[in-house]
Amino acid sequence: MSELPVVSIFTDGACSGNPGPGGWGAILRFGDKEKELKGGEPHTTNNRMELMAAISALEALKKSCQVELYTDSQYVRQGITGWIHGWKRNGWKTADKKPVKNAELWQRLDAALKPHKINWHWVKGHAGHPENERADQLARDGVAMARMQKNVRS
């Protein structure tokens, strides 16, 4: 079996108001090739946009990959590496039997990572990490797009 191609993904989400217009951005890097993705929604939350950044990046991959995914969202990293296992066992309920917030996005993220081997990395936001800063700018572009129209993606 050949080794999986290694792809680095850098994601970020942003929201103007919480809830409010929001955007997400992602950078996918394979060797010396890069692809930028961004999108937004007119009425959303910062956590939903953080999830959409990771989902959209993973869904853009056309074959199984070894993914190094970098996010400044503890919500996404802790959710996907820890909390999700209990949620699935509990029928998408929290430990105190309440419905999981953003369950449909967590389920979509769970499905999007199935074909891949993923290492999740947390980076401190707004701390000068070049790719995180670029993903943040893409997310802010997504907010601007969302203010102008309905749900958008490019």
From Swiss-Prot:
SUPFAM superfamilies associated with the record: Ribonuclease H-like
Q: Name one GO molecular function term.
A: RNA-DNA hybrid ribonuclease activity
Q: Which GO terms describe its cellular component?
A: cytoplasm
Cofactor binding note: Binds 1 Mg(2+) ion per subunit. May bind a second metal ion at a regulatory site, or after substrate binding.
What Gene Ontology terms for biological process does this UniProt record contain?
A: DNA replication, removal of RNA primer
Mainly resides where? cytoplasm
UniProt-listed Enzyme Commission number(s): 3.1.26.4
Necessary cofactors: Mg(2+)
Q: Where does Mg(2+) 2 bind?
A: D12, D136
Places the protein is found: Cytoplasm
User: What InterPro entries does this protein map onto?
Assistant: RNase_H (IPR050092), RNaseH-like_sf (IPR012337), RNaseH_domain (IPR002156), RNaseH_sf (IPR036397), RNaseHI (IPR022892)
Q: Which UniProt keywords apply?
A: Cytoplasm, Endonuclease, Hydrolase, Magnesium, Metal-binding, Nuclease
Q: How does it assemble?
A: Monomer.
Stated family: Belongs to the RNase H family.
The record describes the protein's role as: Endonuclease that specifically degrades the RNA of RNA-DNA hybrids.
Name recorded for this polypeptide: Ribonuclease H
